[in-house]
Amino acid sequence: MLTLSDFDFPLPPELIAQSALPDRSASRLLVVERLAPADTADAVRMVDRAFSDIVDYLRPDDLLVFNDTRVIKARFFGHKPSGGKIEVLVERVVDSHTVLAQVRASKTPTEGSILHLADGAFAVTVGPRVDQFFTLRFPEPALDLIERYGRLPLPPYIRHDPDAYDETRYQTVYARSPGAVAAPTAGLHFDDALFARLNAAGVRRAFLTLHVGAGTFQPVRTENLAEHKMHSEWYAVSADLAQAVRDTRARGGRVIAVGTTSLRALESAAQADGTLAAGSGDTDIFITPGYRFRLVDALITNFHLPKSTLLMLVSALAGVEAIRAAYRHAVEQRYRFFSYGDAMLLTRQPGA
């Protein structure tokens, strides 16, 4: 039985990308080509390419599925009426005036108390606790105040304060549905010029929404993976996407998830017969080796943190040994890791 330690790997800190490249599609792409069905290191071959070369690995009638969520400026600094400092990270917008948020303070705020945010620009009222989150009531539409006064919530491994460049580059070019507190980073590599080439090659694309939560950065704290409680995220799958999947299957194309968030939404909405059910809801799907994929044939994804649930997910798709070999190669070849880093193209291993 695999344990948490099986998903550890050595990563030199200097390989953690601290800023995005000026040209989105100029990132590197590690293509993990499968030579044999077995999950062994010699059953795959590593091919080093530029991300813009991904067109060479896609076929007419393949369907790329993107997550169109938009990152909101979810981080606030402020104070209590007593003067004590606080930090707020919005996790989810519940309705027009209500959010769930993490609140860091020297003393836990109580229900009914007031928190002053953004140098006193406005105040929120603390509501009931929901698991580890606080309900916060905003005096005006929450998304308006978040956009006006919040700060972009860069991941904890990026060490600089967010600036105007990050506000552009930590968003996909197709982001349109505000609600995420982390970017669906595989999509950061796509630009309009690459989309034009994909169109010319007959590659189709479709969109879903999954609002990425801060839980994506939470570490797994149990060696026994079955004891891990996965965070929950809201997603929506449209009838148009469900039809696009049916059309793709009818034409013999592949369903390729752009990013682990797209994959998690697709597999959450997938039916036993391999079709996709339109609808929306919360998902806490936890994909580990042994999972049987219902829908996704391939995945475009960035490189993930050691011992993370996302490293377990890609291992389930491509094979534990294949991913170990790929990550060794990536470290040796000095690929850039994590949100602002490079990407890989993985195909589903036989039987997964």
UniProtKB/Swiss-Prot annotation:
Q: Which domain of life is it from?
A: Bacteria
Gene Ontology CC: one annotated term: cytoplasm
Family, similarity comment: Belongs to the QueA family.
Listed A to Z, the keywords are: Cytoplasm, Queuosine biosynthesis, S-adenosyl-L-methionine, Transferase
To which species is this protein native?
Answer: Cupriavidus necator (strain ATCC 17699 / DSM 428 / KCTC 22496 / NCIMB 10442 / H16 / Stanier 337)
GO biological process terms, semicolon-separated: queuosine biosynthetic process; tRNA wobble guanine modification
- Which regions span the lipid bilayer? none
Which chemical reaction does it catalyze? 7-aminomethyl-7-carbaguanosine(34) in tRNA + S-adenosyl-L-methionine = epoxyqueuosine(34) in tRNA + adenine + L-methionine + 2 H(+)
Q: What does this protein do?
A: Transfers and isomerizes the ribose moiety from AdoMet to the 7-aminomethyl group of 7-deazaguanine (preQ1-tRNA) to give epoxyqueuosine (oQ-tRNA).
Signal sequence residues: none
Q: Name one GO molecular function term.
A: S-adenosylmethionine:tRNA ribosyltransferase-isomerase activity
Keyword Cytoplasm found: yes
How does the annotation summarize its subunit structure? Monomer.
Q: What class of enzyme is it?
A: transferase
Question: Where in or outside the cell?
Answer: Cytoplasm
Q: Please give the name of this protein.
A: S-adenosylmethionine:tRNA ribosyltransferase-isomerase
Pathway of action: tRNA modification; tRNA-queuosine biosynthesis
What EC number(s) is this enzyme filed under? 2.4.99.17
Name of the gene this protein is made from:
queA
Q: Which InterPro entries match?
A: QueA, QueA_dom1, QueA_dom2, QueA_sf
